[in-house]
From Swiss-Prot:
Gene: rplL
UniProt cross-references to Pfam families, sorted A to Z: Ribosomal_L12, Ribosomal_L12_N
PANTHER family according to UniProt: 39S RIBOSOMAL PROTEIN L12 (PTHR45987), LARGE RIBOSOMAL SUBUNIT PROTEIN BL12M (PTHR45987:SF4)
Organism, scientific name: Synechococcus sp. (strain CC9605)
Function: Forms part of the ribosomal stalk which helps the ribosome interact with GTP-bound translation factors. Is thus essential for accurate translation.
NCBIfam families: L12 (TIGR00855)
Protein name, entry field: Large ribosomal subunit protein bL12
Record keywords: Ribonucleoprotein, Ribosomal protein
Family: Belongs to the bacterial ribosomal protein bL12 family.
Length: 129
């Protein structure tokens, strides 16, 4: 590898998980690609190599994705998103209008389920990944 690629690799190794996640989002936006397909392949490989025991391991981090909402429930969904995320009105409105969109990432199962319940009670459709 060249010195430039070695330097980039070392920089990537020093990123926190949150910073790496933000970098992936920026790359997806800048190049118009999605990292979701390749991530699925990477996740499938360790389970296949490790045998059947690891494949049954329960997921510990979830992304909460607002898939959509009933038009009549937009304000209720907006309020529920604000409560779940702590976002301001403008940011929450932009997030709700951009559905489908993840509004919580890398959260525990309990937090994900609580957010899902609150949004669904307000009239939104939510999935956990």
């Amino acid at each position: 590898m060249s010195a430039k690629t070695d330097e980039i690799l070392e920089s990537l190794k020093s990123l926190s998980l949150l910073e790496a996640s933000e970098l992936v989002k920026q790359i997806e936006e800048a190049f118009g690609v999605s990292a979701a397909a390749s991530a699925g392949v990477v996740m499938a490989a360790p389970g296949a190599a490790g045998g059947g025991g690891e494949a049954a391991e329960e997921k510990t981090e979830f992304d909460v994705i607002l898939e959509g909402f009933e038009a009549s429930a937009k304000i209720k969904v907006l309020k529920a998103v604000r409560e779940a995320t702590g976002l301001g009105l403008g940011d929450a409105k932009a997030l709700v209008e951009a559905a489908p969109k993840a509004f919580k990432e890398g959260v525990s199962k309990e937090d994900a389920e609580a957010a899902k319940k609150a949004i669904e009670e307000a009239g939104g459709k939510v999935t956990l990944k």
